[in-house]
Design a protein with these regions (language model features):
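Sparse, context-dependent recognition of short Cys/His-centered cofactor- or disulfide-binding micro-motifs
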Residues: 11, 130-134, 223
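Surface-exposed interaction/gating patches
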Residues: 139-155
Length: 257
């Protein structure tokens, strides 16, 4: 028995597993929801277009679950799994830091891409030695945002004059890829730099000119964004402020995810 992973829930609608996924951790649970087998693989072997993971399982019914992209727990940590642990125990949590001045947790890293997958399989008796291959679709649980701030008047902008952040409660993901109740998390930039953009400026009643101006560019990576009941939860917001704390923009970022 073999399992193939597929990540085609992306803008290109093409399988990008070999290009984006660097590690795989697979769990198999029996019909009682107990862990009976797990395996890890990472590195160059995943980049081969024909990669599959061998399922060292006896014939029977199983629920397979995968967290991919953990990369030694550099960005996310999954609960330690021991034999007979329950499927519901295997949740995944964002590594975060505590801002002692505000008491609010934050992340300022370019998070390693995280993926989740699940699949129910029935493995038949394989007395004839045949090969059975199953396909697990993956969902990406991280998002990278590149924010470009420019002045409509054509005035240059200094990136060092602004702060950018995204606020949400989405750093704790359950075994079924839903969000668990979590504390507020502020995602800070991991890269800011100055860029250039062309701005169309009116020079008269019927004439305009395109001028190159400096813009501020910020990059942030966040955990899983999902639609929720906004009467119960606060919307995840992109917040832009001046260094003096003046609010420049507050944007519901999930509308652009």
């Amino acid at each position: 028995y073999h399992l193939k992973f597929r990540y085609d829930m992306n803008m290109k609608f093409a399988d990008a597993f070999t290009h984006e996924v660097k590690s795989v951790r697979l769990y198999a649970f029996n019909s009682n929801g107990e862990l009976v087998w797990q395996a890890d693989e990472q590195g160059e072997i995943l980049a081969s277009g024909d990669y599959t993971m061998k399922l060292e399982l006896a014939p029977g019914d199983y629920h397979l679950m995968a967290w991919c992209g953990l990369d030694n727990g550099e960005s996310f940590t999954v609960t330690d799994a021991s034999h007979n642990c329950r499927m519901t125990d295997l949740h995944c949590k964002l590594n975060r830091y505590l801002d002692k001045a505000t008491g609010v947790s934050y992340s300022n890293k370019d998070l390693h891409p995280l993926f989740h997958g699940s699949l129910d399989v029935s493995l038949p008796a394989n007395d004839d030695g045949g090969d059975y291959t199953y396909v697990m679709p993956l969902t990406k649980d991280t998002n990278v945002f590149r924010v470009v701030l420019q002045h409509l008047s054509g005035q240059d902008i200094n990136v060092d004059d602004f702060t950018f952040s995204i606020e949400d409660r989405n750093g704790w993901i359950a075994h079924d890829n839903t969000l668990k109740e979590d504390e507020p998390i502020v995602y800070r930039t991991w890269s800011t730099y100055s860029g250039e953009a062309g701005v169309d400026i009116a020079t008269g009643k019927e004439s305009r000119v395109t001028t190159i101006v400096k813009v501020a560019v910020a990059e942030l990576t966040v955990s899983r964004l999902v639609l929720r009941d906004w009467s119960l939860y606060s919307r995840p917001m992109l917040i832009i402020r001046t260094n003096e704390g003046k609010l420049v923009a507050s944007i519901p970022i999930i509308d652009y995810a």
